[in-house]
Amino acid sequence: MISRLSIDLQCLSYDLRGFGESQSQTETDVDRGEPTGGLTSHLLDTSSSQFDSLYTPTAYAQDLVALLQELNITSAWLIGHSLGGTIALWAAALMPDRVQGVICINAGGGIYLKEAFEQFRSAGQRFLQVRPRWLSQLPLIDLLFTRASVARPLDRYWARQRVIDFVVADPEAAVGTLLDSTTEEEVNRLPQLVSQLKQPVYFLAGADDKVMEPKYVRHLASFHRLFQYCADNVIEIPDCGHLAMLEQPDAVAGHIRAIVNGQ
């Protein structure tokens, strides 16, 4: 995706704390008692409970705040996939002057379905418990990841990368993000968060996404002023599942470029 966008746009990607090449940390600025600029004091009646865990979307948004400040990036569009979309939304709320807009890919929600979420959390925990390092060396294991959560098979290169990312993720971070991002409180907070954002927010949905179905993407998008009456801030990509940036990279890059350059 970056290879397509970097032709005319400056791009920066990073691994979430505890994933990829980012090491899991033991504390955030909030845990250390360092100031966060008071940006959350008036937002959504935010309470300190959001920061009790290192793995809430808000805690990860604080990481992004620190990153942009450290790199002295004063103007940026945030693009996030799935949970990354939620993190981008929170970061936009925390940095209204730095963040010019948000593009969420395969991200939505804002409706807490108790039974469905309990099943998802339980199954997810069991799945994450079986992640031996040797799994990535298992012959043909990547073939399984070419078809998981997608509408069209991925190239084996990307499937292989999915396997590696899966097995190297920090155990605490993997479980923590699963549990802390799917609580009733966290899910129900999303619509109000989106409704209060002043920046433009767009949502790219996969027409065949079974993880985050388009109807749930449209639901969350409907709380933003750009939704209007015709889902003007939602773009549905055909023949696409939950990994739009890998399944339909040209289409996604085209939409991102049009949105960013059109503002």
Regions found by a protein language model. Name each.
Residues 3, 196-240:
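Conserved loop-alpha-helix segment in the C-terminal half of the alpha/beta-hydrolase fold
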Residues 3-6, 12-79, 254:
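Active-site loop/oxyanion-hole signature of alpha/beta-hydrolase fold enzymes
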Residues 5, 91-95:
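Aromatic pocket-lining residues of Rossmann-like dinucleotide-binding sites
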Residues 8-10, 74-77, 98-101, 200-202:
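Structural signature of beta-strand start/N-cap positions in the alpha/beta core
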Residues 80-84, 88:
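Gly/Ala-rich beta-loop-alpha elbow adjacent to hydrolase catalytic centers
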Residues 93, 101-133:
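Flexible "cap/lid" loop of the alpha/beta hydrolase fold
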Residues 113-116, 135-196:
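Conserved alpha/beta-hydrolase catalytic His-Asp/Glu region
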Residues 240-249:
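Catalytic histidine-centered segment of alpha/beta-hydrolase-like enzymes
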